[in-house]
Amino acid sequence: MRGGYYVLTALFVVASSEIAAESGHQLQANNHGRKIDDDAAMKSLSTRFLRESRGVHGNVANEERSVYSVLAGMINEGIKKMPRTAEVLKRKSRVIDPSDKIPHEAKLVEEMFHAAKAKETMESAEEYNELKTATEDAEKALKKHWNPSKTAVKGDDSHDIHSNEMLSVKNWWVDFTGLKSTVVDDTQDDMVDSVHNAFVTVCDKNIKPTREETSFLSRLLNWKVANSPRSVHKQRLIQRAQRYVILDLWKMQNTCKVWPEWEKLSDTLKFSVLDYLLNLHYQRLVRMYNIFARKRPDRNPAPLNPELNLVGNTGTSAAMAVNKNSKGQIPYPSEPLNAASTSKGERFHLIKRSKRTSDGNTDIASLPSIRSKVRSSKSVMPLLTESTTSGDHSVPAKRSRFSSSGLSRAFSPYKPGDHTFITENSRLSFDGPRSAVDPYTQSKKHSTKALAPSSTVFTPEDVDTKLSLGGIYDRST
């Protein structure tokens, strides 16, 4: 090795001297000049000695050409490999160092790749339409969420929840007690329907809020929270979006041809699909919340929207039961106090009575001839979350107990070796039917109606069905 080193050094010196002599410059003694001359020699070796040598004849010229051509090829190949070698070494050092975190951009690219791969894999399933149906309505609504709403352009946006946040299933703080069914008392159906119809009038046509969602938003905005009401409301919306994702999982698991395809996916791909579903539902809920907070259809009469046909072919809102007169004219629904209309000689008076309750709600208008008993808003809206309100204080309800009889495990504590993802106080896995939970509980005071996403309709029998979450665990100690 030492002999080869001296040979290479001598060759570099000779070549550099010849190049410098031809160009009329002498080699400089400082390091900077030496580096420049060395670089010039390395770059010119591959071309200078491949042509015929000048002033050299016979075998000596042939020998020089062969030696220098081989040497020049080796040097050039080494130069080309140096950047790649440095890059490989840099990558290895990053992998070895556990404290070095992957940049956010790299994570984003990786997640996008997995999401695209998951979508491509799921589309190959025989019954992919079942999964597609579960997300179709929410996906259509999401397309307009990033643009201003046509029906909610005006209004106070100080209470809006911004939708520029992407949620992740891995970061769930899951409270499964919030999965109990939403119920509405039969005696209050008319009141809920009127508010719901008014809410539909002020919403974009692609949002399509349900009765239960309308009741949920009304109770949420009337819930008196002393500190940070917006952040508390945001958490409730996130929990509801999580509920919708689990209902989608439940529907997919009950489709025998889809679930085996789902179980074939890796956990990474499953989380990508669930992240997609979670954000679709969350963005839709945020849009509904902001419109409801601005318009307050539970307090203010809704303007007529001719684009939405809610009562026959009249194009009027079902929330405002205003009769036409003989000329077919309709009084503006926000007329104060009395709105009178004449039809066939008979005169009807619609009196708008606004009675403020103790918790700030307003009762619905009623005809004076029919004195219907209207309860306060505390009993009007259904129990939607785990806590109930009493005045200005929140009273937490008891945690519902989940039974896993007949199943191998449900809500089991963490055990070493389990292939699950650990969150703050929950575990999320995909073990299929061997883990199940019955999140619904029957209410003695209310008739049960299962809450479902806008794209899914559940019957009362679904309330009694055990909901298998595909291995999503949580147990309170």
Curated annotation (Swiss-Prot):
Gene Ontology CC annotations of this record: extracellular region; host cell nucleus
Protein's UniProt keywords contain Secreted: yes
Subcellular location per the Swiss-Prot or TrEMBL entry: Secreted; Host nucleus
Span(s) of short sequence motif RxLR-dEER: 48-65
Residue ranges crossing the lipid bilayer per the database entry: none
Signal peptide residues on this chain, from the entry's feature table: 1-20
Region (Disordered): 326-345, 351-370, 376-401, 433-455
Keyword terms, alphabetized: Host nucleus, Secreted, Signal, Virulence
Claim: Signal is one of the keywords in the record: yes
Superkingdom of origin: Eukaryota
UniProt record similarity statement: Belongs to the RxLR effector family.
Function comment: Secreted effector that acts as an elicitor that induces cell death in host plant cells.
Entry text on domains: The RxLR-dEER motif acts to carry the protein into the host cell cytoplasm through binding to cell surface phosphatidylinositol-3-phosphate.
Name the UniProt record assigns to this protein: Secreted RxLR effector protein 102
